[in-house]
């Protein structure tokens, strides 16, 4: 082949458009698609643009939260418990212990064998201490139902 024929052959072939990234436009640019349909603009978001959108959204969100937190008022004590977080347990008197515990309550009566019987356990396998007050669970304090023991009213 001479160079004139080679130049004429390459001049008649249009340059192939390049796909921007891995999306559907890559399939449309294949040789199987007729040239009239190959002229397509990709509407997909480039990865760099997507990253800019995510970072920008995170910055705007962080600034919004900081501004909102700065606009909050001073905490107000709970109106129900007057800021104490709860009341002293009425069942144990704030002690957290149950004074009336029998020997049968301490150990499982179904255990066989001599010696000391194993302690009672709840369904999750945790040891139950029968000396703890059942109302306050050994804390000596019943938490306020309005503030959940924080002593302050909800600011939100």
Swiss-Prot record:
Record has Oxidoreductase as a keyword: no
Entry keyword annotation includes Plastid: yes
Role summary: Chloroplast chaperone required for RuBisCo biogenesis and translational regulation of the RuBisCo large subunit (RbcL). Stabilizes an end-state assembly intermediate of eight RbcL subunits until the small subunits (RBCSs) become available to produce a complete stable RuBisCo complex containing eight small and eight large subunits.
Recorded family membership: Belongs to the BSD2 chaperone family.
Protein name per Swiss-Prot or TrEMBL: Protein BUNDLE SHEATH DEFECTIVE 2, chloroplastic
GO BP annotations, alphabetical order: chaperone-mediated protein folding; ribulose bisphosphate carboxylase complex assembly
Domain of life: Eukaryota
Recorded GO CC terms: chloroplast stroma; protein folding chaperone complex
Effect of residue 133 to S: Impaired chaperone properties
Predominant subcellular localization, coarse grouping: plastid
A single MF term (Gene Ontology): protein folding chaperone
Outcome reported for the amino acid change (mutating residue 147 to S): Impaired chaperone properties
């Amino acid at each position: 082949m001479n160079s004139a024929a080679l130049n004429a052959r390459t001049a008649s072939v249009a340059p192939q458009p390049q796909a921007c990234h891995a999306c559907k436009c890559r399939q449309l640019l294949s040789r199987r698609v007729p040239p009239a349909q190959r002229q397509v603009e990709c509407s997909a978001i480039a990865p760099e643009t997507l990253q800019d959108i995510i970072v920008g959204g995170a910055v705007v969100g962080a600034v919004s939260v900081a501004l909102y937190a700065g606009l909050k008022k001073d905490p107000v004590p709970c109106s129900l418990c007057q800021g104490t977080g709860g009341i002293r347990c009425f069942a144990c008197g704030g002690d957290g212990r149950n004074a009336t515990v029998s020997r049968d309550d301490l150990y499982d009566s179904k255990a066989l064998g001599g010696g000391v019987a194993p302690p009672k356990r709840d369904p999750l396998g945790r040891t139950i201490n029968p000396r703890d007050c059942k109302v306050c669970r050994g804390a000596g304090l019943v938490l306020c139902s309005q503030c959940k023991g924080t002593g302050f009213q909800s600011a939100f």
